[in-house]
């Protein structure tokens, strides 16, 4: 699995490239079910957002921790898994 840093992403994700990727994504045949929303505690929410096409599966996970400000941490913590459908391998 490859972990992509914000710095590495910023070097290749130009505004034009992002707009074109979004255009292609909206035209593609991609399944995007309603996100899962789970209150895991009084101060924590888990969001799961799956999507898939013939070639790829993606899963965005988000945890919203309303008490993180007092810990000097971001309220929203998130990650994205990209999986090859032909092998099941997590690639990023």
Where are the regions a protein language model picked out?
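N-terminal ligand-binding/catalytic initiation module
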Residues: 1-92
